[in-house]
Amino acid sequence: MGQKIHPVGFRLGITHEHQSRWFAVPDRYPELLQEDYKLRQYIEQKLGRLAQNNAGISEVRIERKADQIDLEVRTARPGVVVGRGGQGIESLRTGLQGLLGSNRQIRINVVEVQRVDADAYLIAEYIAQQLERRVSFRRVVRQSIQRAQRAGVQGIKIQVSGRLNGAEIARTEWTREGRVPLHTLRADIDYSYCTAKTVYGILGIKVWVFKGEIIPGQEPDPLPPASRDRERDPRDRDREPRRRQQQRRRQQFEDRSNEG
């Protein structure tokens, strides 16, 4: 059933954590759960893909401590969230307090996403933006996979569903590179889903990213830098023997010149 169940929910408590971490009495639990939904919706409207200033929001984590709410916003563009002189955070905090209608203290911690091309939600968001601009889905998927491989992921799978390229009959196409072991619980798999609204209808984008295995008691291995992941051009390997021969000939010519 690893192919059917949600990859993140399947691994909660093993390789993934809950996005909302707090406890409440049963009477207040529905109210606080709705507050979390409103907070995430507000942040998505102000800084998400459809906002005027898209900050590339990847994830919003919420913690509650008495009358205090701690928000951790993971974004690809922290400068857009913070704003000039911190005005962006202050405006966001004021809007959230007005949304909740209370004087509870809200703390916002902005965390930059180190590997944008290895984040499943940001990849799905990028594909949705390109599809809404009527770019060929095959080209967008191929570019996203290449960028993810350069970012150091061990495997990636992308699925696009709907009226692809304006076809009369909807269909589903997917592409996979590397390993994506959905049955392995210790596998660190990032999953996300996004929709693209086109003139032909809504397209669904699903992205699975396999970043490696997390063994209990060991720290997860960081993704290697992009510079190390770039493969050498095979033509350079053919050029190396030629360069060595040219250097030897030059050295022999210089030795003969010195002897003369």
Swiss-Prot record:
Protein name listed in UniProt: Small ribosomal subunit protein uS3
Gene Ontology biological process terms in this record: translation
Family of this protein: Belongs to the universal ribosomal protein uS3 family.
Matching PANTHER family: 30S/40S RIBOSOMAL PROTEIN S3 (PTHR11760), SMALL RIBOSOMAL SUBUNIT PROTEIN US3C (PTHR11760:SF19)
Function of the molecule: Binds the lower part of the 30S subunit head. Binds mRNA in the 70S ribosome, positioning it for translation.
Signal peptide (UniProt feature, chain positions): none
InterPro entries: KH_dom, KH_dom-like_a/b, KH_dom_type_2, KH_sf_prok-type, Ribosomal_S3_C_sf, Ribosomal_uS3_bac-typ, Ribosomal_uS3_C, Ribosomal_uS3_CS
Gene3D superfamilies: 3.30.300.20, Ribosomal protein S3, C-terminal domain
Region spans: Disordered: 217-260
Biased composition (Basic and acidic residues): 227-243, 251-260
Domain of life: Bacteria
Any Pfam family: KH_2
Occurrences of domain KH type-2 (ranges): 39-114
Organism encoding this protein: Nostoc punctiforme (strain ATCC 29133 / PCC 73102)
GO function term, MF aspect, one: mRNA binding
